[in-house]
Amino acid sequence: MDKFLEVIWSPEALRQKELIENTRSQDQFDMYFSKIILLIENIKQNPFKGLGKPELLKYEIPPCWSRRINKKDRLVYRIHKRDIHIISILGHYND
């Protein structure tokens, strides 16, 4: 059983998901989102190590982490109790 109970998407991350879905082909969206799902599953196993080169973001309170989706985009998330909060899935954390 996974250590984490729930994945909670921020309104911004949901907006970004919709933007990606509406501006890319279905194949591109499927490939992009399958990478996000893979990263989330890896976060459930170990939130601070693993795929996507996890990096603690400096100066963020509460602490946030990022993982590489691709060369340009990062999955930014934070852990709160047993929940994974997805903050952003498009661009870098400081874009």
What are the roles of these predicted feature ranges?
Residues 17-18, 44:
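Short amphipathic alpha-helical interface segments enriched in basic and hydrophobic/aromatic residues
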